[in-house]
């Protein structure tokens, strides 16, 4: 992940949206324009993570810039800062469903609508969540299907093993090399008050200032975390066998 205190735990900071889904990643404070990817993981098996999507922006080519999760045949969940305020033209945005290697077999899908949480302003204030409506529903299969969202009452105890996936950097300033495989890494849930204390290390905000808010969830461990390239992507945890 993004390190504010390299000698401490590197913590994956996620916001728990109103939908009660821990399904996207937010960068650390002070790094709002940097996305996050995977460090310390391995290539994901082709049979896993069928809800993973890649968000693409138009340029010299359709460049990957954020991750997301398919939560319905026609809806993708991602981070608000991935699309707000930079994405003004829907024609410049595409969604690529689960693929093992970026760019090799693209079938880019157009987006018809972006819904950003009305309370989102900047990452540090929380509510960093957005929904993308696809122009057409996708065909659900064993290779492509939705992730299960937890109920609002679900809790994620400290130490609970979860997984982060994406196509981001594999280390600080080290880009994912060709053929750009989807990566995965297992990370434990970290208590919010510990996470908040770690994020204050080296800052001058005072400990009364809450960096990790109540609508956020922390997960991560030393050398196993996220890095630049996949903000908005999923954090998934196995609960009751699902």
UniProtKB/Swiss-Prot annotation:
Q: Which GO terms describe its molecular function?
A: serine-type endopeptidase activity; serine-type peptidase activity
SUPFAM superfamilies cross-referenced by the UniProt entry: Trypsin-like serine proteases
Q: Which CDD domains match?
A: Tryp_SPc
Q: Which Pfam families match?
A: Trypsin (PF00089)
Q: List the disulfide bonds.
A: 66-82, 162-237, 195-218
Q: Which residues are glycosylated?
A: 139
Any idea where this protein resides?
Secreted
SMART domains, A to Z: Tryp_SPc
Where is it chiefly localized?
A: secreted
> What are the boundaries of the signal sequence?
1-25
Supply the PROSITE patterns for this chain: TRYPSIN_DOM, TRYPSIN_HIS, TRYPSIN_SER
Provide a GO biological process annotation: proteolysis
Question: What's in the keyword line of the UniProt record?
Answer: Disulfide bond, Glycoprotein, Hydrolase, Protease, Secreted, Serine protease, Signal, Zymogen
Q: Where is the Peptidase S1 domain?
A: 38-242
Give the propeptide positions. Answer: 26-37
Tissue specificity, please? Expressed in colon, lung, heart and synovial tissue. May be specific to mast cells.
Enzyme Commission designation: 3.4.21.59
- Superkingdom is Eukaryota
Family the UniProt entry places it in: Belongs to the peptidase S1 family. Tryptase subfamily.
Query: What interactions and quaternary structure are annotated?
Result: Homotetramer.
Q: What is this protein called?
A: Tryptase delta
Q: Which species is this UniProt entry from?
A: Homo sapiens
């Amino acid at each position: 992940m993004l390190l504010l205190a390299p000698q401490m735990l590197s913590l994956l900071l996620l916001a728990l949206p109103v939908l009660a889904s821990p399904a996207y990643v937010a960068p650390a404070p002070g790094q709002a324009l940097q996305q996050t990817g995977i460090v310390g993981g391995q290539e994901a098996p082709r049979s896993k993570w069928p809800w993973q999507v890649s968000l693409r922006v138009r340029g010299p080519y359709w460049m990957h810039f954020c991750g997301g999760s398919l939560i319905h045949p026609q809806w993708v969940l991602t981070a608000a800062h991935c699309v707000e305020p930079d994405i003004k033209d829907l024609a410049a945005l595409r969604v690529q469903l689960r693929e093992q290697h970026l760019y090799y077999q693209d079938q880019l899908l157009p987006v018809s609508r972006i819904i950003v949480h009305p309370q989102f302003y900047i990452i540090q204030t929380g509510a960093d969540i957005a929904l993308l409506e696809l122009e057409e529903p996708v065909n659900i299969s064993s290779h492509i299907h939705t992730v299960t969202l937890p109920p609002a009452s679900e809790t994620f105890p400290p130490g609970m093993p979860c997984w982060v996936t994406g196509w981001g950097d594999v280390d600080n300033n080290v880009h994912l090399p060709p053929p750009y495989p989807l990566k995965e890494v297992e990370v434990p849930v970290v208590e919010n008050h510990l996470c908040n204390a770690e994020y204050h290390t080296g800052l001058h905000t005072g400990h009364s200032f809450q960096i990790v808010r109540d609508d956020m969830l922390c997960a991560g461990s030393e050398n196993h975390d996220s890095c630049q390239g996949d903000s908005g992507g999923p954090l998934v945890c196995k609960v009751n066998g699902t």
